[in-house]
Regions:
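Phosphate-coordinating catalytic segments in nucleotide- and nucleic-acid-processing enzymes
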Residues: 1-118, 124, 129
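Short, charged/polar micro-motifs that form catalytic or ligand-binding hotspots
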Residues: 57, 105-108, 141-142, 164-168
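Active-site Asp-x-Gly
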Residues: 109-112, 148, 153
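The start of beta-strands in P-loop NTPase/AAA+ ATPase cores
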Residues: 132-133
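Walker B catalytic motif
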Residues: 136-139
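C-terminal lobe/lid and adjacent interdomain/linker elements of RecA-like ASCE P-loop ATPase modules
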Residues: 150-179
């Protein structure tokens, strides 16, 4: 498998595109992350194969839970919920962050740029299997320094599990996380 995630990823949207061909046939999340939410929704219960990528003491190997754990390292306290709009070719992403007033989930548009921008990268790395290739452009975009360092750690752990990762970055924090 091969995934390329461009620097100009989708920002927060009111809904995201579905593509059964890209998501099921090609196992792609889109060069701009446009199918990341659909991929996560349709593969949420699959187990992560790369043991090196598994998050800390988290007992669940489910894809969605592992993605949430890693997103939580980059943007603390995040949980996700996908809302399928039935026969539409669109799907919604709802986000909850610990510390928000109330226990509500909010649309991606109402929680800032970082989560939407980083989700395709985290998903690509967590779902990757040994022998796959991932090319990432500017994974540090819209992340604070700690989030950039954690992104570097995630990249390094994917590579330790046999995933070939090519990264174009201008961030010392990403490089420090990889070390």
């Amino acid at each position: 498998g091969f995934n390329y995630i461009a620097a100009d990823r989708l920002g927060p949207q009111s809904s995201y595109e579905k593509s059964y061909y890209e998501v099921w046939e090609q196992e792609q999340i889109g060069n701009h992350g446009e199918y990341a939410v659909h991929y996560l929704q349709t593969h949420e219960s699959e187990e992560v194969e790369n043991k090196n990528i598994l998050y800390g003491e988290e007992p669940s190997r489910r894809l969605q839970r592992q993605v949430e754990c890693w997103l939580g390292e980059i943007t603390p306290g995040v949980s996700l919920r996908m809302e399928d709009y039935g026969h539409s070719n669109r799907i919604g992403l709802m986000v909850h962050q610990e510390g928000n007033i109330g226990a509500d989930y909010f649309t991606a548009q109402n929680v800032g740029f970082g989560i939407s921008y980083v989700l395709p990268i985290v998903l690509a790395l967590v779902k990757a299997k040994k022998g796959e290739l991932i090319i990432l452009e500017n994974p540090e975009a819209h992340l604070h320094p700690r989030g950039q360092r954690k992104m570097g750690e995630l990249i390094a752990r994917a590579a330790q599990g046999g995933v070939q990762v090519i990264v174009e970055t201008h961030s010392d924090h990403i490089l420090n996380g990889i070390r």
